């Protein structure tokens, strides 16, 4: 199952790591909307390997976000199937949703807190109830390093630039250590230099942190 192979030996159930990351496959994703039954997804088949960084590119209204929502399992009103390492996502969504991260186009952060405070309160919600303060602090340090915001940890969110706020939103989702990571137009409104920096960070996450990353962009 996902990164593990279950082996039953007499009275013991063993778990063996067999792969890193999550591979995603779509089979015949199809969706129609409206009274005219306009086709938004037309039997989409694709395969994304584990730890790949993939961009879904297209113009406005092309169905990019619709496809991503179908891939993530959050849109149930889609024909076809999605498999994560061979496991049907729709049939096992409640068990698999914890490994899925999603960053919407609108930043998901509280602007009247410092970055560290915001991450701390978010960690209290996202991490298990028995997580210690030391473990939370260690996780915050880790995600700050991942998104290259360590030097801004005591900065109020409202004083951050657009690119920094986007990285803060990504840090929020990284607290739960998702293996499959979706981002909706993360570079929207960013200048070319900031966009390049963000793309470099995302590429690094996929290569060094065992994350499969799928983003939507124009």
Where are these regions (language model features)?
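Helix-to-loop junction immediately C-terminal to a conserved catalytic motif
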Residues: 72
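ABC ATPase NBD Q-loop/coupling interface
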Residues: 81-95
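Q-loop/switch helix immediately C-terminal to the Walker
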Residues: 111-128, 139
